[in-house]
């Protein structure tokens, strides 16, 4: 059984929605077991709620130590000024012990993201890759492997590096059908690669 983890941070629910679609796609691959988890929220709960954060998220909270249990990890990261959120950065900064043991070396990794008005979505994905490369993970982008990537009839997310969604400046825009289709493709593609590599 190939084990895939969809690991995310989501403040307003956009990445949570994308994570569910990523998982749907991964579950389409035979012999793959998919788990969705989130990183711990580091904001004070009262401040998080006051900022409009989505406090009800069904995914359990992950610990860095359990990353070794998976063959592939698909990271969901909101964009903050062209980088991952501090919550995801804090989580990954706790994986130094895993790095020292080479515990994630050779595991599959992929990244999807959200952003307000499009600024930094690609940079967020590629800057996240840097950390994953230090672990020796095998990074799987999505290229232009799905027809939705060529649909430019309206403004929306989607990059060859990974699925993205545009949340709008106030966060009111939710992932649309095209963005979710790209997310499902990413999940299926990564799970397929992971299953092939596991043999």
Curated annotation (Swiss-Prot):
Co-factor note (free text): Binds 1 FMN per monomer.
UniProt KW Oxidoreductase keyword: yes
Residues reported in the UniProt entry to bind FMN: 10-15, 79-81, 134
Keywords: Flavoprotein, FMN, NAD, NADP, Nucleotide-binding, Oxidoreductase
Entry binding sites for NAD(+): 12
GO CC terms in record: membrane
Family designation: Belongs to the WrbA family.
Protein name per Swiss-Prot or TrEMBL: NAD(P)H dehydrogenase (quinone)
Source organism (scientific name): Tolumonas auensis (strain DSM 9187 / NBRC 110442 / TA 4)
